[in-house]
Each structure stands twice: as C-alpha cells, then as structure tokens.
C-alpha cells in the first residue's frame, strides 16, 4: 500500500476543500492516487469540484520576450523572495530570456547548459540554490504579453488588435483556461468528466437513462468553463471571451501561461499538528 504522507493529505485538502480525515480516508481507498481520490470524492459528493494541481511554493520570476512573431516565457527559480529581487539573479534571468527569444526552439536543457557557469557562480556568491526551470514558446501574427508581478506570465497569439489581446492575456492570468475553444477540449478529458457527472447523477438517485441525458447539458457547461472563449470575460462577466473578441474583430489562435513554482513543493514545518492528529486515528 502506498504511503499516505501529510503533504499528500494537505494537497488534497487544498484542492477539494474537504476535511483532513475525509481526505486521508479517500487517499487510503485510492492507494495514494490523488487524482483517483478526487474523482471518488466528487462522485460521492464530498467535493463538488477540485482545483488543478499546481502547488506554488518556490520563489523566482517569470520573464517574457516577443520578437518578430515569436514569443517566449522563461521561469527561473530560487529559494527565497529576497533573492528573487536580487540584482544579480534578475540580471541572469533577463540574459536567459534574451537568449531564449533569439534562439527559436531552444530546449530547457540547452538553456541550462548555456548558462550553467553563470548560474553556479551566482549560487556560490549568494549561497542559495537557483535553477532555470522552464521555457515555453508561441508563434503568431500578433502576440501580446501580460506579466503579473513577475510571478505569472501569459502570452496570447492571434489576429487583430494587440491591445485587445493583452486584455485577453490578463484574463488568462486570472482564470487559467486550459484550451482555446470548447471544441478543443480533448475527447479523453470530456469522457472522463462525463463519467464523473453520470456517477454523480446516479448516486443522487437518478436512473441511468435519465442521468445520461442530464449530463449532456452539464458537459456543455464544463467545456465552456475550461476553454478561453467559453469563459465569462473577467473585464465584463456579462459576455464570454469569445463574444468579446468578435465584437472587437480579434481572434486568438493560442496562449501559454506560466506561474512561478507550479508543481514544486517545499517542506513545511507548520503541518506538524495535523500530522500528529492523523497518527491518533
């Protein structure tokens, strides 16, 4: 049986809003598989929805560069917010971003190798580990960028007004869509959600035939919620992003979004009380 760690329980709590013991029980039943635990909790009504994985615990910066129909986002991490504001750290991060946009198609491995000497020297000087973690690229006729405090970076590519695309980039930063259009949602994602919704309806007492019919409406809502053009526009919730784009004669072909520390978790010392409580049951 998989080990159910305190950090795993904590992540499940953060993503579902359920109680500590409910989360521990769900993880035990799912043999430590957090995604399966979330699915089971949704089906049983313990969790109405779950936040996407992406524990943001690392420090660092996201930088953006755009040049001739090509844009890049680069993430560079460090251990503390103090170092994230250090002139030497920011100088290296900016050099990495400049190199990335000038060398289309560069891999993260190539970036790391190119700047390893400078990185190692800075680590020795400051005494804190740091890494060039991610690079993401986008191409398009018009590209707009939005950086939120150097912690979230978004690039949106499309046609039309750069100013309007920047507004959309701000929306992407806030709302975290996963796809551009509802029809872009992959079949496996749709089927996975469909089965969850059918189980939820059946568990509420509905016959399978009725449950399956009910789910069709829910699926349309689901694909709209996870797609950019189907979401309510943050600057005008009375209309969708898609409707707004049509009104300003602008379209989106693609977007990329990076947030500092996504998927990285630091060991936390303030979880001891809950760990102790877990051991008593």
Swiss-Prot record:
<dbReference type="InterPro" id="IPR001816">
    <property type="entry name" value="Transl_elong_EFTs/EF1B"/>
</dbReference>
<dbReference type="InterPro" id="IPR009060">
    <property type="entry name" value="UBA-like_sf"/>
</dbReference>
<comment type="similarity">
    <text>Belongs to the EF-Ts family.</text>
</comment>
<dbReference type="InterPro" id="IPR036402">
    <property type="entry name" value="EF-Ts_dimer_sf"/>
</dbReference>
<keyword id="KW-0251">Elongation factor</keyword>
<comment type="function">
    <text>Associates with the EF-Tu.GDP complex and induces the exchange of GDP to GTP. It remains bound to the aminoacyl-tRNA.EF-Tu.GTP complex up to the GTP hydrolysis stage on the ribosome.</text>
</comment>
<keyword id="KW-0648">Protein biosynthesis</keyword>
<dbReference type="InterPro" id="IPR014039">
    <property type="entry name" value="Transl_elong_EFTs/EF1B_dimer"/>
</dbReference>
<feature type="region of interest" description="Involved in Mg(2+) ion dislocation from EF-Tu">
    <location>
        <begin position="80"/>
        <end position="83"/>
    </location>
</feature>
<keyword id="KW-0963">Cytoplasm</keyword>
<dbReference type="GO" id="GO:0003746">
    <property type="term" value="F:translation elongation factor activity"/>
</dbReference>
<protein>
    <recommendedName>
        <fullName>Elongation factor Ts</fullName>
    </recommendedName>
</protein>
<dbReference type="GO" id="GO:0005737">
    <property type="term" value="C:cytoplasm"/>
</dbReference>
<dbReference type="Pfam" id="PF00889">
    <property type="entry name" value="EF_TS"/>
</dbReference>
<dbReference type="InterPro" id="IPR018101">
    <property type="entry name" value="Transl_elong_Ts_CS"/>
</dbReference>
């Amino acid at each position: 049986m998989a080990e159910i760690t305190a950090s795993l329980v904590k992540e499940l709590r953060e993503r579902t809003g359920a109680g500590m013991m409910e989360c521990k029980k769900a993880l035990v039943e799912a043999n430590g598989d957090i995604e399966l635990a979330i699915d089971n909790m949704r089906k049983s009504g313990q969790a109405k929805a779950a936040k996407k994985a992406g524990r943001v615990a690392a420090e660092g910066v996201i930088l953006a560069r755009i040049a001739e129909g090509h844009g890049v986002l680069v993430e560079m991490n460090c251990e503390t917010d103090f170092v994230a504001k250090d002139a030497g750290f920011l100088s290296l991060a900016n050099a990495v971003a400049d190199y990335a946009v000038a060398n289309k198609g560069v891999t993260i491995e190539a970036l790391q190798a190119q700047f390893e000497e400078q990185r190692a020297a800075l680590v020795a000087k400051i005494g804190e580990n740091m890494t060039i973690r991610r690079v993401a690229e986008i191409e398009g006729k018009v590209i707009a960028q939005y950086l939120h405090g150097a912690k979230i970076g978004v690039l949106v590519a499309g046609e039309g007004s750069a100013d309007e695309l920047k507004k959309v980039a701000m929306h992407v930063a806030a709302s975290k869509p996963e796809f551009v259009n509802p029809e872009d949602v992959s079949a496996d994602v749709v089927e996975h959600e469909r089965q969850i919704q059918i189980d939820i309806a059946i568990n509420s007492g509905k016959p399978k035939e009725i449950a399956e019919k009910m789910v069709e409406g829910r699926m349309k809502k689901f694909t709209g919620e996870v797609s950019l053009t189907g979401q309510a526009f943050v600057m005008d919730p009375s209309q969708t992003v898609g409707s707004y784009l049509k009104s300003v004669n602008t379209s989106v072909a693609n977007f990329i979004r990076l947030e500092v520390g996504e998927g990285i978790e630091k060991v936390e010392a303030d979880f001891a009380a809950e760990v102790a409580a877990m051991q008593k049951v």
